[in-house]
Amino acid sequence: MAADSREEKDGELNVLDDILTEVPEQDDELYNPESEQDKNEKKGSKRKSERMESIDTKRQKPSIHSRQLISKPLSSSVSNNKRIVSTKGKSVTEYKNEEYQRSERNKRLDADRKIRLSSSSSREPYKSQPEKPCLRKRDSERRAKSPTPDGSERIGLEVDRRASRSSQSSKEEGNSEEYGSDHETGSSASSEQGNNTENEEEGGEEDVEEDEEVDEDGDDDEEVDEDAEEEEDEEEDEEEEDEEEEEEEEEEYEQDERDQKEEGNDYDTRSEASDSGSESVSFTDGSVRSGSGTDGSDEKKKERKRARGISPIVFDRSGSSASESYAGSEKKHEKLSSSVRAVRKDQTSKLKYVLQDARFFLIKSNNHENVSLAKAKGVWSTLPVNEKKLNLAFRSARSVILIFSVRESGKFQGFARLSSESHHGGSPIHWVLPAGMSAKMLGGVFKIDWICRRELPFTKSAHLTNPWNEHKPVKIGRDGQEIELECGTQLCLLFPPDESIDLYQLIHKMRHKRRMHSQPRSRGRPSRREPVRDVGRRRPEDYDIHNSRKKPRIDYPPEFHQRPGYLKDPRYQEVDSFTNLIPNRRFSGVRRDVFLNGSYNDYVREFHNMGPPPPWQGMPPYPGIEQPPHHPYYQHHAPPPQAHPPYSGHHPVPHEARYRDKRVHDYDMRVDDFLRRTQAVVSGRRSRPRERDRERERDRPRDNRRDRERDRGRDRERERERICDRDRDRGERGRYRR
């Protein structure tokens, strides 16, 4: 009995020691893996020593490693070689200690239920995710566990696995507080699975220990143990169901991987930035990552990566947090068909053709409404300074590209091409103007063709600088800032392609505009469609400055010479060899060269210098012209020929020919006379009001003088009348006095 009471006291002291040392603080929310690992190692070493003692004593007082959650403080007290003592024949103090122990167990059971519910609810979101790397790791951990009863090694491995798993996944790092709350209860859930598998493998031995313990347990302890075992059985059933679900999901995942291998996908769906373990978790078939964190495992991983020819499929755990990278990375990694690639390549080549030799201008808008209006109507208005600049660029450049950006938006809103110069007087466009600015301050309206209506963030163009704006980033600039050709081209190519735009029509417009502009301004060479005219075959009228009208020519048909009434060409009529005058003309005193090529003033001067014309018929040749006194040398000889010898041998022309020739050649003179008269009339009409004004101005002083003289005469007459009246009055008064 003395030995039994001593053993009972030792057991109670062990239980109290476990309670005081191993119960974690429930309010502590931080998880320290090192301190937890130290506690687990102490606990494992105690269990190992106690088990060895129980084997040495041939299981006289065997202990039980009950299948309970390690997170419960009850498991540590039950598994530490507990001595079951009946309450019969105990003292009052011992009985009170037993009651205190039972109340503490019940409290801990209630706390464990709450913690278990919270931990299970925190794990559910991870199970519902489509990616299943965490489930595969759990299965691999269960396979990799050895059946050895060394609890300290298993617990250390589990802690290392938890640490490496948290470092591999950014999601698990974000949710480390939830995992920490699970660990605060005293141990990790994975060690619970290790104890369960150990109990399954050593089932026979545990059954014997349980039978011996039940025989020795008291009534109160049996009730507590039965309640705990029922809860543990329920938890085991839940865990088995979870494990079955995990195994099914693992099989589905492995089947998917086999299908992908059979299809022979030789491309890498992994982004270059996701190679680091902190962003993604990668898997390989036939390999298990235990996450032990040792150097050997790291070397094996590196060797596997070098030996592998096909890149592994990497599952991005970031989920919905990658909202910005969705548009870029999703399109990069999706496998495009050859037709889609060809269409995009064709679009890029067309865009490069449009941007070739273009001029680029940055357009800054004050609000999104104006840009939306421009996208809808295809028009734009700017200040007169920029309007003049854009008009000059449109005339000189092949294309003018406007890159739009709303102030303080952080993005470019698209780019368009000018399709016309600015025009005024059309239907007004209701722009949204800032305070203090009226629509009259804007210039004309440009028509534009949009090339891309999609947006481009400034962050995508941070590497581009504008040499024409002091090498500042291309996003910086005032409204109308011109961008250098290479910089503008690269900026436009950064925009996402806009499939709603038909670049073929835009190219057609460009060619039409270039053709229209090339026709009026041919640079030194005639166009292909314009007939080439030989410069050497120009008519002499083209060189005549004074001859603004085309002179009539008489071109006779070849049969004209055989007519019976044929007369010689009047252009070759006889010319007086002495005076070089055209004979028998109406104005015969005018020289031929003056008559043909001289101006009207020369003609009038010659006409006034000569005498009156001769009569038409019945008179000797040249009777009205005074013959100059003959030189003695020419008295008996004919005078020498003059300047035009070919005309000297012709005979006199009859009157009909002279009249016909006169009708032709007098046309010009009649026109000149008509113009002179009309000009005189018009100038006279214009001069008449001037002359009237001058006459009025001249007459004004005369009229003023006349008026003044009249006024003076009237004043004189009035004074005379007054004087006469005075004299009369005086005379009459004198008469009355007498």
From Swiss-Prot:
Gene Ontology BP term (one): in utero embryonic development
Post-translational modifications reported in the UniProt record: Tyrosine phosphorylated.
Regions of compositional bias (Low complexity) in chain numbering: 318-328
Phosphoserine: modified positions: S35, S118, S120, S146, S311, S318, S320, S321, S323, S427, S438, S548
Chain positions recorded as RNA binding sites: K364, S365, N366, W380, W431, D479
Tissue expression remark: Ubiquitous.
GO cellular component: nuclear body; nuclear speck; nucleoplasm; nucleus
Main location: nucleus
Positions with biased composition (Basic residues): 512-526
Region called Disordered, residue ranges: 1-341, 512-566, 618-654, 680-738
PROSITE patterns, A to Z: YTH
Domains: entry comment: The YTH domain mediates RNA-binding.
Stated name of the protein: YTH domain-containing protein 1
Organism: Rattus norvegicus (Rat)
